[in-house]
Amino acid sequence: MKMEEFSPPTSPNNHVIVQANPQIAAALSTNSPMQQGIPPQGHQNPNEQQQQQQFVGQPPMGGMGGPMRMQMPQQQIRQMPYPSPQMRAGPPPPQQQQQQHFQQMGIPQQQQPQQFTPNGQSMQMQQRPMQMGMAQGPGPSGHLMGMVGGPPPQHMMQQQGGGGPPQFVPNSSPMPLPPQQIMQVQHQQQHQQPPPSQQIQQPPIPQPQQQQAPPPQMIPAAVPYGSIMEKSKLDDLMQQISSTTVLEENVKDVLVEYADDFVSSLIDKACKMIKNREVKKIESRDIEFILKNVYNMPVVPRAASHNFGSQTEVIDLSKEKFVPTEAHKQRVALLKKQIKKL
């Protein structure tokens, strides 16, 4: 008796179901062993190979996107009497599964540097894809859709292109400290800070009182300030001329004022004269010239020759007229009397 071949009904939704669930597609495409018979070794159904390629090429949709597992062709596998070395070692780590998954999807990966344990053994860092729009997650498998990456490891090693020795790179973001350590650090900083300088108000030093000297007694001067001649000198001069003559106070004041005015006018005329010569020093010959030409006064013998006018001009004292005064006449009379007594 022949067995009737059973074929699934064709419908437009079969293609959608096959793409949505690869296991159903594999079951539908696989013939029963009674129809197909025992396949030879190394033989693989072309429908299974095509479905396997479609399953591998399809990217994971939505969600957390864990590593995709490869679907092996449904073949009769003989059970091994003892486990294989791969089974002994256990299932491959999720890192290798993830690496295989991204290699099949054609996504480039960035090779992470190696990290060394304290025992000196190198431990390969997890390889994660570096693609626009994807972020690294803290778990073993990277998340694709907008997941925020966890903190990077503290000590990383940069692998050089020439295969040089790895270099330690310090972590850019410091690890948060526990609150106890933070309090200890703040306490140490407060102790290290110098205390604010305290201004010590020193008592004012008593200054020794200086003994105030009594104000000097103002003695009225006989000569006013700036006067050239004093009254006492006038008395001495009068005693030389006539011992019997006595000057009154009013006469003395007038004589002092007259002497000051005479000296001031004499100096004023001398300054005007040297100004014409463009010099800044008054000489004795300037005063002699003014006394002779302006006041008609005889000059002293030491200034008999001068350079004013012609150089050959010489003053002759014999030509000067001497007019004796009354005091001179009295002195001469006294001398004559004394001579007669002798």
From Swiss-Prot:
Job description of the protein: Part of the general transcription factor complex TFIID. Plays a role in recruiting taf-4 to the nucleus and thereby activating transcription initiation by RNA polymerase II, as part of the TFIID complex.
Biased composition (Polar residues): 12-35
Keywords: Nucleus, Transcription, Transcription regulation
Molecular-function GO terms, alphabetical: DNA binding; protein heterodimerization activity; TBP-class protein binding
Domain remark in the UniProt entry: The histone-fold domain mediates hetero-dimer protein-protein interactions.
UniProt-recorded name of the protein: Transcription initiation factor TFIID subunit 12
Similarity annotation: Belongs to the TAF12 family.
Gene expressing this chain: taf-12
Location(s), subcellular: Nucleus
GO cellular component terms listed in the entry, alphabetical order: nucleus; SAGA complex; transcription factor TFIID complex
Bilayer-spanning residue ranges: none
Source organism of the structure: Caenorhabditis elegans
Record text on subunit structure and interactions: Interacts (via histone-fold domain) with taf-4 (via the histone-fold domain). Interaction may facilitate the nuclear localization of taf-4.
Residue ranges, annotated region (Disordered): 1-221
